[in-house]
Design a protein with these regions (language model features):
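A structural detector for beta-sheet-dominated domains
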Residues: 17, 28-30, 59, 77-79, ...
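OB-fold (S1/OB) nucleic-acid-binding surfaces
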Residues: 26-51
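Short nucleic-acid-contacting surface segments enriched for D/E, G, S/T with interspersed K/R
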Residues: 56-76
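Short, charged beta-turn/beta-strand-edge "cap" motif at the junction between a beta-strand
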Residues: 79-85
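C-terminal partner/receptor-binding element of secreted or periplasmic proteins
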Residues: 91-106
Length: 106
């Protein structure tokens, strides 16, 4: 099993833990092989004082499936090459500082 996995093609299981307005989405990943420097180990939502663990802000807001509801889980890959050029409103909702661009898999 000496195959080196390309990290970019790894599939991860995410959970949409906060579906904020204007695509301010917070995603939780509890997989140890997910790049740990891309997530915040602990993050407290100052609007609700709720603490989350292992979360990031959704950067790739343009093609995130609308069908995914808060607390739904989904499979995804990290995709840092995509451009996120779409209109989105700018209302402030607290989100983690770290953001990741992803592609959701069906």
């Amino acid at each position: 099993s000496g195959l080196i996995k390309e990290p970019i093609s790894n599939t991860f299981l995410g959970k949409l833990v906060k579906k904020g307005i204007c695509m301010n989405y917070v995603i939780e990943v509890n997989e140890s092989d997910f790049p740990q420097d891309m997530i915040e180990k602990k993050w407290t939502d100052e609007s609700s004082n709720k603490e989350y663990k292992n979360v990031f802000r959704l950067e790739s807001i343009c093609d995130f499936p609308e069908s995914i509801k808060e607390n739904d889980s989904f499979n995804f890959v990290i995709d840092n090459d995509k451009e996120n050029l779409c209109a989105v409103c700018y209302a402030y909702t607290p989100t983690p500082d770290k953001s990741v661009s992803i592609t959701v898999l069906d």
